[in-house]
Amino acid sequence: IQSTSMDQGBLSEDSMNSFIRTLIQAGIWKNKVPKQTARTKDGTQTAVKKTKAEPDVVANKDRLGFQPIVSVDAELLRQQRRFSSPRVLLSENTPLEPPPLYLTEEPMGLNRTSRRKRFAEGKSHRGEYSVCDSESRWVTDKSSAVDIRGHQVTVLGEIRMGPS
């Protein structure tokens, strides 16, 4: 992917809009691949020229739900590293599987309403919160629990209100 003068706009633009514009210019957005490649038996890639009948075949495949797999060049990710977003993290590294939250065998892991920061590699110190399921159900036979800070607390059987 080569950058054009349009990519080098002023730095006050939204970083994700700039990234999406770069993808659109490269033909990656909406599954448009600028150049088709084919693999030979020895694993090397060669460029394939389109024939006149090929656009009809591609259009029919798109109507049937076929979507080609598009790989994004690692150089594009390196160029976009300066952009930061609270929701999207562009990284060349694959995420940990499973996330560190599920590896801990603590009472905190059993509390499905708590949120814990995951460990983030590098210098960004970005806090990633795991998304937990919510469960609306009364529990009547519980005498102790773990609060959102991880402290053991006693569950009151009854609450007295008003003058005593």
Swiss-Prot record:
Chain ranges passing through the membrane: none
GO cellular component: axon; dendrite; extracellular space; synaptic vesicle
Keyword Secreted: yes
Protein name in UniProt: Neurotrophin-3
Leader sequence residues: 1-3
UniProt cross-references to InterPro entries, sorted A to Z: Cystine-knot_cytokine (IPR029034), Nerve_growth_factor-like (IPR020408), Nerve_growth_factor-rel (IPR002072), Neurotrophin-3 (IPR015578), NTF3_N (IPR045815)
GO molecular function: growth factor activity; nerve growth factor receptor binding
Function: Seems to promote the survival of visceral and proprioceptive sensory neurons.
Region (Disordered) location: 89-126
SUPFAM superfamilies the UniProt entry points to: Cystine-knot cytokines
Family: Belongs to the NGF-beta family.
BP-aspect Gene Ontology terms: cell surface receptor protein tyrosine kinase signaling pathway; modulation of chemical synaptic transmission; negative regulation of neuron apoptotic process; nerve development; nerve growth factor signaling pathway; neuron projection morphogenesis
Residues cleaved off as propeptide: 4-118
Cystine pairings recorded for this chain: none
